[in-house]
Amino acid sequence: MQQFKKFLPWIILGIIALWGIAKYNGMVGKDQEVKRTWADVESDYQRRMDLIPNLVNTVKGYANFEQETLTKVVEARAKATSVNIDPSNLTPDKLAQFQQAQDGVSSALGRLMVVMEKYPDLKANQNFLDLQAQLEGTENRISVARKRFNEAVQIYNSAILGFPSNIVAMIGGFKEKGFFKSADGADKAPTVDFGK
């Protein structure tokens, strides 16, 4: 028994060390999941960015089309592609900056779709209809990717903020990550009618 008492502090220290290592490794896994889901978000936004030049070129073929609307779409795309975020540093501020740029693209595309209602020939163009369908599908993929990202961030943040795990997180340099938030006015459903 005397022998056991002599090793008891070492046993307790070993158990604490193993617990800390397990917690650290779990946090690394959750951090990697956040990075993976972020890559999915970026990939879907990139797909949307890749569709925009084709959409703009299709619309440009209609001489009377409002040039200002096309210019705003191109400018919003350029601004959004200039905002790059390091996935290991997804702070709430940087994520808000990224989201603001992407919301600018969404807004410009929304205005473009509204203006296109005035051009029945354009709405009958098969290339335009294909691009429109691809864009709608991409917007859905973006929505799903953002939801999965937010879920991964919630799991990660819960893992690093709870006590006593927060001690391991502090020692390991794990920091809280930001969520995607809904855009201003997102609580009101937009009116979209491509059938006219």
Predicted segments with their positions:
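A helix-centric hydrophobic-segment signal that preferentially recognizes long
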Residues: 1-196
